[in-house]
Amino acid sequence: MHTDYIHIILADDDEDDRLFFTDAFSELKINTKVHTYNDGVELMNYLNSDEAVLPQVLFLDLNMPKKNGIECLHEIKSNKKFDDIAIAIYSTSSSEEHIEETFVSGANIYIKKPNDFDTLKKVLSDVVAINWQYHTSGLNK
């Protein structure tokens, strides 16, 4: 998919974290469209719908009610339709066990949620810049 913006989705049950995330993107000088979902069930219902616009980057919180980030990751990785989505786990956990499990399950990157806004903007900017280079260079084929 070639667009002039990067479509980003965040699934996170914490409203403050969702606002922090969208505010950070609104301050970055990167052309993005950001959509958020409250939990894994809501996210997967959207991704599996006929009207879904698949994101280039999907940020998944690990600990969500109904369907957690690992369950979403497994479901996404089991469907070829989602092969081009870069998946970033976005969590408060820095447990090596959690980190290893996410990479073994197919995540592309693991991000520990930053405590301050400037660090969050830097991390998100770096992730999007790497993804943008990947997609615009044709490496995703």
Residue ranges with predicted function:
Residues 1-9, 15-30, 116-141:
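Non-catalytic signal-transmission and effector/linker regions of two-component phosphorelay proteins
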Residues 3, 19, 23, 71, ...:
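Alpha4 helix (beta4-alpha4-beta5 surface) of REC/receiver domains from two-component response regulators
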Residues 12, 60-61, 91:
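Active-site residues of response regulator receiver
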Residues 56, 84-94:
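A short, hydrophobic beta-strand element within the central beta-sheet of small alpha/beta folds
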Residues 58, 110-111:
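Two-component signal transduction core modules
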Residues 64:
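Receiver (REC) domain active-site loop signature in two-component systems and cognate sites
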